[in-house]
Amino acid sequence: MPQVVEVLVEGGKASPGPPLGPAIGPLGLNVKQVVDEINKATKEFEGMQVPVKIIVEDPKKKTFRIEVGIPPTSQLIKKELGIPKGSSEPVHSPVGNLTMEQVIKIAKMKIDQMLAPTLKAASKEVIGTALSMGVTVEGKDPREVQREIDEGLYDELFAKAEEAE
């Protein structure tokens, strides 16, 4: 049975130091080779924390493969808005604003990892994360936008986004 090591690394900037080195050193793998593979696989997520699985397929032959997960929703929102972090007072001092198009873009990236059955439901999850980060949506309180989604205000936008797939 293959051994699996799960770590959270900065996209494109994994290094042999902690948390990676100590986790994979005991497995007998070439740490530099693993780090290089991870950096190659995560370079598109530069500046974001990315979940990575290192699967040791054959410890004797030292063969492994890398599986890159999708960064947390909060990381995708920060990257989309170009902000360093969420608000320390989410209700009183918003740090950015997402458009519905941006919400749908993030929801499409994350939908396979969410429990949401539809793009609409996944978008509402993204909006919930935006709320906790102090990010408005369409210039409004995210809860208001979630109600508008329930009322069908953005149905045309969702239909267009689902056709594009």
UniProtKB/Swiss-Prot annotation:
Single GO cellular component term: large ribosomal subunit
Q: Which SMART domains match?
A: RL11
Q: Keywords for this entry? A: Ribonucleoprotein, Ribosomal protein, RNA-binding, rRNA-binding
Q: Which Pfam families match?
A: Ribosomal_L11 (PF00298), Ribosomal_L11_N (PF03946)
MF annotations from Gene Ontology: large ribosomal subunit rRNA binding; structural constituent of ribosome
Q: Per its UniProt record, what Gene3D superfamilies does this chain match?
A: Ribosomal protein L11, C-terminal domain, Ribosomal protein L11/L12, N-terminal domain
One of the GO BP terms on file: translation
Keyword Protease on this protein?
A: no
Free-text function comment from the UniProt entry: Forms part of the ribosomal stalk which helps the ribosome interact with GTP-bound translation factors.
Q: How does it assemble?
A: Part of the ribosomal stalk of the 50S ribosomal subunit. Interacts with L10 and the large rRNA to form the base of the stalk. L10 forms an elongated spine to which L12 dimers bind in a sequential fashion forming a multimeric L10(L12)X complex.
Q: Which family does it belong to?
A: Belongs to the universal ribosomal protein uL11 family.
Q: What is this protein called?
A: Large ribosomal subunit protein uL11
